[in-house]
Amino acid sequence: MRPFIHDDFLLHTDAARDLYHSFAKAEPIFDYHCHLPQQQILENHQFADLAEIWLGGDHYKWRAMRANGVKERFCTGAATPREKFDAWVGAVPHTLRNPLYHWSHLELARYFGIFDLINQKSADKIWREANEKLATMRVHDILAANKVAVICTTDDPADSLEQHEKIKKLGIKTRVYPTFRPDKALNVGSPAAYNAWLEKLAGAAKTKIASFDDFLSALKKRHDDFHAIGGRLSDHGMENCYAEPCTATEAQAIFDAARAGRAASVADQAKFASFMMLEFGRWDAKKGWTKQLHLGALRNNNTRLLATLGPDTGFDSIGDFPQTRALSRYLDTLDSTDELPRTVLYNLNPADNYAFATMIGNFQDGSVPGKMQFGSGWWFLDQKEAMEWQMNALSNQGLLSRFVGMLTDSRSFLSYTRHEYFRRTLCNLIGAEMERGEIPNDRELVGPMVRRICFANAREYFRLELDPSFRG
């Protein structure tokens, strides 16, 4: 009997199978957005057991466990690694039709050569065999086995870049770059947290922040530092874009008030964010960076568990914020002075798919293929159905052939199977259309496009320095 995970998993036509095995499968991975801990890359971390590498930091799995009636101590609490593993294994059969069922079986198959269905009967065997394999596996082995050419971590301007500097000297083929994510620079509505962050920023920039000009200079210095170490991407996670009129004088007054401990009003927070986002856009454009906008998350919905566990532990959801008008004004303001950088737009609400897919077309300027990108399905949308929605919207309103493809957006080193999952979904979608006669059943036409979406488009678009073996 064929195992659940097999060579042709998710590939339902001959054309899909040919596209995947001949054009997609062997391509390297360009992971241009993730949340991997660079400390574990630096130290070439060896994971103690399957629970650490499989469950640690994975809020997708924690949400499913809670939904299955699992107590918090088995998710993020003090239960033993084996107890946490057993709690997850008990939950997996209940995740049928959830992408976690696919992902979890792919992870065991690809990293550990385990093809058993995950359940309580197979738990002892999985635990034993995976831990035996982990004893011979370190982070660098995982990166090499998956042919990971690039990792772009997510970094605050106040974070030290020391680990990135050390990783650069390791000599591994995977290049690791920081991504400039200045979300906390906008937080003038919470003066205590804001001022504590400003002190950290001042330390990272090796300067004092006594004025608004000092603040801008410190941020600009950190932007320069990220560039010097090879970073070429920025990222912003916001409920929606901001495009309110705001002069430098108004922004300075809002900053000064927050520095003095007075919280900005909601209206002033929007004005300040609007001013700063334009500054960030201009800096990115001047240096030839790519800006990423992650829009639409409603975060930290459970205040009780936020207070107990902190953010990014599985209590966020899709928001229904108005997106298009402010986004249009923001992009247009930068474009009107020829200061719009390459931009990747990600929406979390699938209702915005066609709005975002059409928005990028307004600002393609012919300077580079696919300057404006509609990003791959993000977070709650990085599963088969929603990835198809995103690719269909992009295909119908733009050029799928110029798409920069998949990213992990993950905190787990096992998540490189997400690229395989995406590639299989891509090939199945296109292969079905080839066999229905909706596009030519011509592998010499379609195959190279698939290959480019899997790696080369991202390599050419982001223009990061790669190891010679990945330069093509």
Swiss-Prot record:
State the SUPFAM superfamilies in the record: Metallo-dependent hydrolases (SSF51556)
Keywords of the record: Isomerase
EC? 5.3.1.12
InterPro entries reported in the protein's UniProt record? Metal_Hydrolase, Uronate_isomerase
Which pathway does the record list? Carbohydrate metabolism; pentose and glucuronate interconversion
**Biological-process GO terms, alphabetical:** D-galacturonate catabolic process; D-glucuronate catabolic process
User: Example GO molecular function term?
Assistant: glucuronate isomerase activity
Catalytic activity reported = D-glucuronate = D-fructuronate; aldehydo-D-galacturonate = keto-D-tagaturonate
NCBIfam families from the entry?
A: PRK02925.1
Family in the record: Belongs to the metallo-dependent hydrolases superfamily. Uronate isomerase family.
Name of the protein this chain belongs to: Uronate isomerase
The organism of origin for this protein: Opitutus terrae (strain DSM 11246 / JCM 15787 / PB90-1)
Instruction: Point out the gene that encodes the protein.
Output: uxaC
